[in-house]
């Protein structure tokens, strides 16, 4: 073999080795699947103040049945757990299912395999379950958490919600119904509950209703491997600093105001 032939042979061998390594995932950047299965990820945990939600949508099934004393009138309710960035949605979901979801026909989405105990807990802590919110949240967001089944996705979400509801943040909201709650008040309670860094890792959402500004939702910035820990303080401390919140508003009581 002449020198040119030897050079071509060596080049071909190197290229083949690189290609094989790439196929086996030993070179280049790891795939999204491998990132999600072991390394940290960023999320937003969205929780609602349900009376405020029902102020806007009183005809929803979960709002027609809302009564004083029900869990969601004095505790935050689960909206969803959203992998970030925000365009991380509908992973490996059929175009037909995506179209059904985007049209708002959530009752026509495929049923989820959930245990009886979990369904009962969701009905209590995620009132939108009555309007099939759980199906929407799974197909839009939960499918982008590789290795998570619907059961595990909602178990983790409810675990995080329970920790928030056991904190000074929930006590502050429940203790100030029908009064104005400022952003600083919420921020201080959030810091007491989860550490000073937490004060820059949540968004307070509000909306206008006949001249009133109403506290509607909290979005918690968290980061970590949810397969390893669901300790909310730990996840919040690793979360991204988030953007501007509303300056505060009324904590809405049950019923139309």
Which role fits each region the language model picked out?
Residues 26-176:
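Catalytic cores of phosphodiester-bond-cleaving enzymes
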């Amino acid at each position: 073999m002449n020198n040119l032939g030897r050079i071509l042979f060596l080049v071909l061998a190197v290229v083949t080795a690189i290609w094989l390594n790439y196929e086996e995932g030993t070179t280049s950047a790891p795939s999204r699947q491998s990132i999600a299965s072991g390394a940290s990820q960023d999320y937003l945990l969205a929780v609602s103040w349900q009376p405020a939600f029902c102020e806007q949508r009183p005809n929803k099934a979960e709002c027609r049945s809302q009564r004083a004393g029900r869990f969601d009138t004095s505790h935050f309710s689960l909206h969803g757990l959203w992998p970030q960035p925000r365009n991380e949605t509908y992973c490996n979901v059929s175009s037909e299912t995506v179209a059904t979801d985007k049209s708002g026909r959530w009752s026509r989405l495929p049923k989820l395999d959930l245990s009886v105990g979990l369904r009962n807990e969701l009905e209590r802590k995620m009132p939108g379950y009555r309007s099939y919110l759980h199906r929407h949240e799974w197909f839009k967001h939960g499918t982008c958490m590789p290795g998570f089944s619907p059961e595990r996705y909602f178990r983790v979400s409810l675990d995080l919600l329970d920790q928030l509801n056991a904190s000074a943040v929930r006590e502050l909201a429940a203790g100030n119904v029908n009064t104005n709650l400022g952003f600083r008040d919420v921020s201080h309670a959030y810091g007491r509950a989860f550490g000073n860094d937490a004060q820059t890792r949540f968004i307070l959402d509000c909306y206008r209703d006949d001249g009133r500004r109403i506290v509607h939702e909290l979005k918690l910035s968290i980061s970590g491997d949810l397969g390893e820990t669901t300790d909310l303080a730990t996840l919040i401390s690793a979360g991204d600093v988030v953007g501007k919140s509303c300056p505060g508003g009324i904590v809405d009581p049950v019923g139309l105001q």
